[in-house]
């Protein structure tokens, strides 16, 4: 959910690598990285982590965004859905429910 120093993420990566994991990716909502970028650089260079995915829901430092192992996930579209749902007093589940979209796409190709 939140990566601050990243110690727990790196602990998982090291443990899984010992169990012969080929690749390790981490995902977090808030990539704060208050410290610890160098530890992630080293883990990436040594093959312990393949990448980290973090959303654009909080500030990401230019130093973090330059890292080859960090991948930003743009969730602004979903924030717009949340705001629209609140403003129209509807459940977000009806907005994000993919079933109707899938049915519509399938009907176009039958």
What is each PLM-predicted segment?
Residues 2-110:
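PRPP-associated nucleotide enzymes
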């Amino acid at each position: 959910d939140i990566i601050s120093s990243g110690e727990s993420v790196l602990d998982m990566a090291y443990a899984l690598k010992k169990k012969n994991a080929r690749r390790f990716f981490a995902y977090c909502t808030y990539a704060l990285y208050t410290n610890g970028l160098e530890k992630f650089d080293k883990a990436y260079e040594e093959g312990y982590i393949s990448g980290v995915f973090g959303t654009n829901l909080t500030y990401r430092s230019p130093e973090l965004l330059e890292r080859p192992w960090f991948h930003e996930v743009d969730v602004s579209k979903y924030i717009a859905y949340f705001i629209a749902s609140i403003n129209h007093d509807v459940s977000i589940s009806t907005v994000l429910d993919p079933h109707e979209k899938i049915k519509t796409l399938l009907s176009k190709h039958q």
